[in-house]
Amino acid sequence: MIPILDNKDASAPSVFRPAALLREARRQKGLAAADIPAICILDPDGDIVRHIMRTGEAQPFKAWPCYHTRLDTFTLAGQTAGIVGCAVGAPFAVLVAEELFACGCRLLLSLTSAGQIAPAGLPPYFVLIERALRDEGTSYHYAPPSEYAEADPALAAAALAAIEREGLHAIAGASWTTDAPFRETLAAIEAAKSKGVLAVEMEAAALYAFAKAAGVRILCFAHVTNTMGQTGGDFEKGEADGTADALRILAAIVRSGVAGSANAPAQTPI
C-alpha cells in the first residue's frame, strides 16, 4: 500500500501527544501552565495579526509554550480571543490546533485566502467551508479515507445565520484542500469544478478531520481573493488587506453567541 494510506489507524492512540511536547517546552522556557482564550483564530496569511500589531490591539500571550509560533490576544466583539498567524498548510495548522486545544481553546476559527474554483461572484468574497476535498496528507492520520472532511453541520449553520443577521455575506460550500498550490493543474481544477467546489486552500480538510476525531469545535472560512494569478490585478483582498471584512465576519460569529458554548468543558484531544 502507498505510504499515505499505510499503517493508518485513526482509532489507535498516538505515542507522541501535544501535552508531552508542551510540558517539555514549558520546562525549557521556564513557563507556568496557563489557559489560553477559549476562542482562538488561525490566520494563515498573517494579515489579521499584522493589522492588530500595527494598531496596538495585539497583546502577546507570554505563557504560550509552542516552539514554532507566537500567540497574541486581542478583543473581538467584546471577548478576548487568541490568534496565531502564518501557520500555512495542513500539517502546520493541525499541529498548532492540537496545541491550542491542549492549552484551553474551545472554539477555533480558521480564515485563509483562497483561489476561486467554481465562480460564485467577483473576488474577494467569503466561503464558509461545509466540506473539504481531502487532497492533502494530514487528514488520513485522523480519519479513514473518504472524499471529503466535513464541518460540524450545526456549528456551520449557526455561524452562517449569525453572519447573515448582521447583513454580511458568506457562501456555504465546498473547498479543495491541497498540499501543493503550485501544482494546481488544469485537469485538477476542472475536476474540482465539476464537483461544485468553490475554492482551493490548504488547511480545512485536515482541521475538520482532526476536529471530528478529537471531539473539538473548528470552523473554516476561505476568503476567495484570486483566480490563481490568471488575470491581472489578482490577489486583491480589500480594505486593510482584507482584514476589515474578515474581522466583521469573525466578530459576527462571536457576538451571536455561537461561540458561547466555547466555554463548555473541554474535550480531551486524541
Name the predicted role of every residue range:
Residues 1-107, 115-270:
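Accessory terminal and edge-of-domain segments that mediate assembly/interaction
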